[in-house]
């Protein structure tokens, strides 16, 4: 109905839920109802963290939560860029959007908050939308492409220069509300409990991060550095998770940077600069992330970088999650190639040069032809065509990312137990078991295939708990800040007196609350599951890489016992 109100939350809520994802969860349970994801009663919530808008390194992020139309569970997505920074500097920690507009609309936040009916912008893809709104004022724009308008279940909410709240399909929720965009411009100073000490800490952490080899690698190569690092570990799946037989060097970060004119992109307050912008013809386009290159490269069987750049550009403009889109299309290619699907409405898109993929992406985003079925995601579509569940690369209906569980077994257990579906960012065990650990909080690297001990499973649990704090603070996952510095940053910004033990307990409680909410939304214990497609041994690879059924059952059983013991 266009009503706008501003409310303050009690201090105890901030202490218990921190901000970002945590406060989003609190607001969802406070204002949300058990309803269809596309119901007006399903709120769309955008939040900043206590560090957002401050100079703390790599804190320029925001969180989006709602009930996911893809998983039908609690959906959460995190994005960088400048939107979160501007939201916080406009004087707000977040927003809860109820109902649905009767006409496509835009929310503007600058000196005041207003809702404008803008049917002229409905039908535009994201880049045109962004340009139009920036002509009016230098806004940070968060908005939809055509996929969100058409309620593609894995549509993303784009912002700024190719940044995306990508996973769980929250763009479709935004589209169901007839909300095309939110445009924000903020110039206020974010209050800090102890400004001098906070700035001193910021300098210390920035210096530490800049000197880190991981930071230097990401700055030089972007996230595509994993195309170079992961191949020797068997971590980059090819041929729809059936092997690792691919010329990975053809899509290496070295080749990318030598062939194309590339510049780096920094989100707000970022000291890393992992983003990439590519000059292609007369345009500068957003470069692909590792997950995009891997899912549209080796997973599909394509070594043409030009095609990946083109597809990534279209997917971002249409506003879809590149992981879900890439896994879906790679699965279809495999099913067509092996005769599992012979339907001409699908097989017609696939040939040896992948010339039909561009049309397939556009048809999905536009809900056109077979795209109207494919927009439901891989699991729903594959089951409707008789593909057995164990051959579908999803967990809780969300497509599996590009880190092979057979390379890092705890990553597989993390996929199975994640509250939002297959998710490599809720616990980055592929990094932990390569030595990026935090032993002081029980995150300890170990043998990537020997995981059947309490210490190893607790490493996953502790990593999951700590990730909740990162996503609530909010800090970019690439910034490996020492836990004691995270505690100090939160205390100096909020005035609270957190300890690391208290924050780890908060992380555990947030996961417990998300799981309890998911159960109310229909999740069952059997949904903690990993398909045998990504567990079975690949010919010629070590026996210990396989995750057999009995091992998976044992890991899940002990995980749940240990999770209950720390809750």
Where are the regions a protein language model picked out?
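Intrinsically disordered, low-complexity segments enriched in small residues
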Residues: 1-78, 82-567
């Amino acid at each position: 109905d266009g009503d706008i109100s501003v409310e303050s939350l009690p201090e105890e809520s901030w202490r218990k839920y921190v901000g970002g994802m945590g406060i989003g969860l609190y607001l969802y349970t406070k204002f949300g109802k058990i309803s269809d994801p596309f119901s007006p009663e399903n709120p769309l919530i955008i939040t900043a963290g206590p560090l957002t808008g401050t100079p703390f390194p790599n804190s320029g992020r925001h969180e989006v939560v709602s009930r996911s139309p893809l998983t039908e569970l609690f959906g959460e997505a995190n994005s960088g860029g400048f939107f979160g920074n501007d939201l916080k500097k406009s004087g707000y920690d977040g927003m809860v959007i109820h109902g649905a507009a009767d006409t496509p609309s835009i929310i503007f936040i600058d000196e005041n908050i207003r809702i404008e009916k803008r049917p002229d912008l409905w039908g535009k893809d994201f880049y045109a939308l962004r340009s139009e709104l920036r002509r009016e004022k230098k806004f940070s724009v968060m908005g939809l492409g055509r996929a969100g308008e058409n309620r593609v279940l894995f549509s993303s909410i784009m912002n700024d220069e190719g940044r995306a709240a990508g996973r769980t399909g929250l763009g479709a929720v935004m589209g169901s509300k007839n909300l095309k965009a939110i445009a924000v411009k903020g110039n206020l100073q974010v209050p800090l409990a102890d400004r001098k000490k906070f700035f001193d800490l910021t300098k210390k952490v920035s210096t530490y991060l800049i000197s880190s080899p991981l930071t230097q690698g990401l700055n030089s190569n972007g996230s595509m550095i994993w195309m170079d690092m992961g191949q020797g570990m068997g971590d980059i799946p090819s041929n729809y998770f059936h092997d690792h037989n691919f010329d990975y060097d053809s899509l290496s970060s070295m080749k990318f940077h030598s062939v194309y004119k590339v510049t780096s992109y920094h989100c707000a307050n970022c000291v890393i600069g992992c983003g990439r912008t590519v000059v292609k013809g007369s345009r500068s386009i957003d470069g692909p992330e590792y997950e995009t290159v891997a899912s549209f490269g080796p997973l599909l069987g394509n070594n043409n970088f030009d095609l990946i750049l083109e597809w990534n550009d279209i997917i971002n403009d249409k506003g879809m999650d590149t992981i879900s889109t890439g896994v879906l299309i790679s699965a279809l290619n495999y099913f067509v190639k092996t005769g599992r699907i012979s339907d001409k409405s699908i097989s017609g898109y696939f040939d040896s040069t992948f010339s039909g993929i561009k049309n397939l992406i556009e048809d999905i985003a536009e809900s056109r032809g077979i795209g109207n079925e494919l927009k439901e995601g891989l699991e729903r579509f594959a089951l409707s065509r008789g593909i057995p569940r164990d051959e579908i690369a999803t967990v809780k209906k969300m497509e599996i990312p590009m880190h092979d569980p057979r390379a890092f077994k705890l990553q597989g257990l993390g996929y199975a137990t994640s509250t939002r579906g297959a998710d490599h960012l809720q616990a980055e065990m592929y990094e932990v078991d390569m030595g990026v650990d935090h032993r002081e909080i029980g995150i300890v690297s170990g043998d990537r295939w020997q995981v059947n001990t309490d210490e190893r499973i607790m490493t996953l649990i502790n990593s999951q708990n700590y990730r909740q704090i990162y996503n609530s603070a909010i800090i970019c996952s690439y910034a490996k800040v020492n836990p004691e510095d995270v505690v100090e940053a939160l205390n100096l910004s909020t005035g609270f007196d957190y300890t690391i033990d208290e924050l780890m307990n908060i992380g555990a409680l947030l996961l417990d609350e998300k799981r309890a909410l998911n159960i109310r939304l229909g999740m069952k214990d059997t949904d903690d599951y990993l398909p045998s497609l990504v567990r079975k041994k690949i010919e010629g690879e070590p026996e210990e890489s396989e995750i057999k059924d009995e091992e998976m059952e044992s890991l899940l059983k002990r995980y749940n016992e240990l999770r209950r013991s720390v809750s």
